[in-house]
């Protein structure tokens, strides 16, 4: 029998709570309060009501005819549980490791960022996020507590417990946790990488009345603080002075009487290549659920024009999340994601064909287009009479610059990727109080199609006399499985114990086909297909298979909410490493003392939490070793015929395998050890939060290619060896203040500071005389050899430039 109930929801100050959810528990029957906090609902006799609102603690009450309900402010931030990996969690105030927590993602998602990496920018001490050129498809770089590897500080992203899983949409993010110290990241072992671990928790299906939400964000982006190259007049004066000082004759191209445009500024190249980029994000989410069955469906569309001309990035994403409670012990969950990604990108960093670098070197006297025929401009004169008179097109004024607008407009680099991820979880809980078993299986399938057309380039200083099309597609299959047993319980109200045991396994393989075409008679966009190429060459390639297995254990103990100890251990077996050396152990230990809970600490409203903590841990960097390192790999099977696919009749694929690098049976992964000392302080009724940390991170067994005394005639590359050590020491400070002005207005202010000293403590290589050698990076840049090098005792990748005594300020100083 049903009945109609009425009621009013207010806060502790007696003010109405507008929009509070009132739900008949176990059903989808519900409503929300009006502007006066009132509600009316038809429910079953004896029904249980669930009343909730953001920022307030939820309540469950038996339905009555007339109800007055007072919601209290939610103090869950004090009891907020921070996910630490593999189902383990700990109250934020009880943490003994150094982690950064972002729970205000609803605010962060409205920032003008196009990636999850961008959401982290400026939010956490010791976490540095930098953009990768103006290309909208470029993923920002993340460095946590300093660079520790020559092979890149790759960060491991773990989404809902699955390493490497995609994030359907930034709007789907519920919280982000950054494991900054090795003690917290050690539970991920060699997968942690040199950069650290970022844990993302997404929104899930939940119980409640059907709800439909739509979020949209629009904005613009501009490149700021751009480099200001010399104008044409300044470039001409610089050339005149440099040649005069060297006692040389000025080239004809820099003689205004012969090349009349060389001293006239006609193009601001930075202004030409950059634009105001428009971006938009749309997200639609539908949630419906009961106590036993809940479903959430979301769709997202993101589009970013990019701040560089003729670039874009688009994402379409569909996600389904469902939870099915079969009985009081067993729950099955499913998370299914489909992502479609399209982009048009451009090289931004290469020494000659990087669009931004080219704009810096392109003379200001050049034009984007030749005014006579509309072709792409250079620095040669457009007047044929001058060329006829002087017999030159003044290539010496052009140098080796490339028209950057040609790179942006005529080069056609297009990428389309489609991927599907499915994660199925089985949870069996509380058959024994506190005991839970979780089994998870993830499968992913990815297809990519890539196309890059490079036209003929006729700039006199850096020509490219042939065109080409690179086209490849690949398929990636991967699976991961995890089985975890956890036990959490409290004894005698003082002894809290948490135990975790887990095993994981993963497998990865990629197969692809690459075809290159060249000598296109017509470069029109509708003819940029391999069938129009003069000739083609094809390659078949395989990456993997790669397999890894891990064993994990974790033990946490706390006494009387004052003393906290946590120990973890992980052993990784890596299929890509030599058999005799394919495993490693990654232990960690943390401790914390909550001084504010001691009997001798006076109770007051000023200091709410005072805690000191210490941690030590070890992690590895498996990503620094290629998938096929120890195995002979399939040769790139190829054919080259006149504009045809597949070998001619009677011809076969090449089908042998080979080792391209000398194998080192003792090779192991790069390893980092780090210790951390920290203080956490909450004051003024938890409105002020302060965290201070000092850390020392040592990365050793760095992986480098052996180049010293390696013979070039052996036919294979030098073996990889473990040598060298990098230290990062630093201090971090994180501070935030949150408060309410009234029931409708609140504010939050935060700031952070970090100082890091990076040093190569052991270079690993030695010169013939026994002195420490140097790492010289990846060669030169625009004919400048090794502009950055690494020496023992110096920071990683330091600039090595020509020393000067300063600039002459007057003719008298020159004399």
Give the predicted meaning of each segment.
Residues 343-362, 763-769:
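Low-complexity intrinsically disordered tracts that form flexible linkers/tails across taxa
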Residues 154, 280, 315-317, 321-340, ...:
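Extracellular/periplasmic, surface-exposed regions of secreted and cell-surface proteins
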Residues 11, 24, 34, 370-371, ...:
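Acidic surface patches and DE-rich sequence motifs
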Residues 213-263, 514, 628, 738-815:
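Conserved small-residue
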Residues 245-265, 279-281, 352-405:
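Acidic, glycine-rich flexible loop segments
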Residues 209-211, 355-356, 360, 773, ...:
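An aromatic- and glycine-enriched ligand-binding surface/loop that stacks and positions planar moieties
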Residues 92-93, 187-189, 208-209, 223-225, ...:
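Switch/connector loops and helix/strand junctions flanking conserved nucleotide-binding motifs
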Residues 1-319, 324-326, 331-333, 339, ...:
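Short, small/polar-rich motifs associated with maturation and membrane association
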